[in-house]
Curated annotation (Swiss-Prot):
This is Pentatricopeptide repeat-containing protein At5g11310, mitochondrial. One of its GO terms (cellular component) is nucleus. Belongs to the PPR family. P subfamily. Keywords: Mitochondrion, Repeat, Transit peptide.
Amino acid sequence: MNSLFTAFRRNLLLNPNPHRNFFLHRLLSSSRRSSPLIPVEPLIQRIQSPAVPDSTCTPPQQNTVSKTDLSTISNLLENTDVVPGSSLESALDETGIEPSVELVHALFDRLSSSPMLLHSVFKWAEMKPGFTLSPSLFDSVVNSLCKAREFEIAWSLVFDRVRSDEGSNLVSADTFIVLIRRYARAGMVQQAIRAFEFARSYEPVCKSATELRLLEVLLDALCKEGHVREASMYLERIGGTMDSNWVPSVRIFNILLNGWFRSRKLKQAEKLWEEMKAMNVKPTVVTYGTLIEGYCRMRRVQIAMEVLEEMKMAEMEINFMVFNPIIDGLGEAGRLSEALGMMERFFVCESGPTIVTYNSLVKNFCKAGDLPGASKILKMMMTRGVDPTTTTYNHFFKYFSKHNKTEEGMNLYFKLIEAGHSPDRLTYHLILKMLCEDGKLSLAMQVNKEMKNRGIDPDLLTTTMLIHLLCRLEMLEEAFEEFDNAVRRGIIPQYITFKMIDNGLRSKGMSDMAKRLSSLMSSLPHSKKLPNTYREAVDAPPDKDRRKSILHRAEAMSDVLKGCRNPRKLVKMRGSHKKAVGEDINLIDDINERNGDAGDFE
């Protein structure tokens, strides 16, 4: 195992393309012998025969962008000494590169998790003669700023354009959709509502059709973030300003139905369903699909099957929106044979199973620990011409991560790279989680480097996990560097992560670095709240003082034992003492488990 990881580590250092390497082929041979065969479909043929581009997609900007220019600016932005602002703009001037809309778009795509750096790039590009801002790039800038919760800067950009002659060309309904969704995601309900109301008053987007679309976006954004009650109340309020005969659209009902089900409020969902029928709003396939998915989400698969029968009686077309939730619900309930039987019924439909159907089955077979069953589903979908996606393989990585099968997980990763697949952020998070939990720090750092080379920056969860592992291994300079890089990318680390590094630095006498860390943290908006379980232990002095504290508790317990005659009290005290000592010993491991785990990504 160690030699296998050593080979991979050397391979990553020497070759950015690990699939062109002897070690990889040896690993692939090992994977075929040591684990159930997980088929991986090569993408070489697809690359040689590109599909006809979809006219609805964003035009391919990469083709018109100089790779040299893109690489030069990307390397500059990844330099840890570069900070957003005028100094970065001066450094960009020194490159001599003339920015284009396509180049800036490509940078936004590549460095999406570094919003403040990208804002400086945008300001630099905008000042260049001949640079013409496009509506899609403007919306990307607004989205990037809102993602970093720099709403004030985003609004200043919007207001500047609204007041100018180019406002109607740049500030569109899509701009306000970005603002509304980002506010909702940040839990800022009233601000999301005010963004919608401002859009209603802005003449270029206040047409009735656009206003209804924005209302639906607002309700959808609030419901998806769990603010269904607020969405319902606002709909009632705005309904009072409409014509007396106004009835919410079926889409609005669908959004609220989905919201109540997502919030697990079954009574409210069923009440809304009755109101919809009372208002003679005709349900659509989406409505029935929402009901079925909602019941399945709440583990009421049998009721979902009854709704399916109701659809049949209404002679409505039954498609993937109906079958997929039922198949997933049966799988989640462990009724995998019934899920396969339902898929057989799905085959007779015109549309047939989709990638979502197969991914659901793969997910639930992996959850059940049936890796051969999941592999069979994978072979089935390939046979039927459905290409597996990164999401498909991520379910296998979840299985390997959960069951500490690091070698099998790494073997699958190599096979995907060799076949031409591009792992996504979740793939790397799961791989890093496996390696961190297995204590393979060197390999984890190399995989982290490989992830960045592929243009994927680690998110908060991945960054937290790496920093906590570095702290546990007392690699404090590396932990500080990861913390600093995260802040530069616009990520605000958790306060408990700061405390772990700070305590470690101070215990090692690294006071200068501890001061730099404190200065960095004080510049960020953050909460100083720590989990109650860990507050005393994290803030407590380490090593010698902790041992003194434990000895003091032991002496106190000894004194109590001498004078206590009640056996029940002794049992209670003993349990309390064991718990306290256990918390002292296992503190850092507990922190890592709570803050480092990715959870169950769907």
